[in-house]
């Protein structure tokens, strides 16, 4: 589980599923399955937010010919503060989902052999609900932004990150 600080939930759930098999818990209760799935969705959201907004967005928002001093997350914050802010908030939302389902934002212990060690309380669920639609809208907005960027210069993206090896 402590192999990675970006995707510890994936490692945690893989370990829990391995132990499930060892102890003969081939089926876990439906609620536990949903909590584990929600935990993993939180992981996916926060991990993808880090990847896109902090690591990849400079390449999509600025040309490759842009200076390295500008084509980075600081440049995104300067030129596209709303996009940068959304990335931070999307990641935080994903981490809150993890915290509520796994006990901590990083290296949680929510999945145990045969299920999970707690359910999501009504108060915890209600904590997540108000921002859910906004988070989904921001995700859709990024897809629109990528589509616009691609359509403006498909050749740029056709060979993006491809390296001829022989």
Model-derived features: positions:
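Active-site bordering "gate/hinge" segments
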Residues: 1-166
